[in-house]
């Protein structure tokens, strides 16, 4: 079975109808071995379920998360991570500017 491609989003642009997304941001907090909080500086943070992936990164590390979007019983958005990539060499300020430009096209 083929997976859908992940839509590139910033946290504040995530829609409830999104199925598979990718979000780049900083690890704000690693709560347990089960999840972390991701912050892309767009406002809100998002909970990332990391039960199915290895996370060799620490807090404040820049990562890209690819996974399925879920809504919790409380109505919060959560990403079930399939892939986590190291993005430390990315110029995050330029990335955010390019994202805004692509959004207007």
Q: What is the predicted role of each segment?
A:
Residues 1-105:
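OB-fold and OB-like single-stranded nucleic-acid-recognition modules
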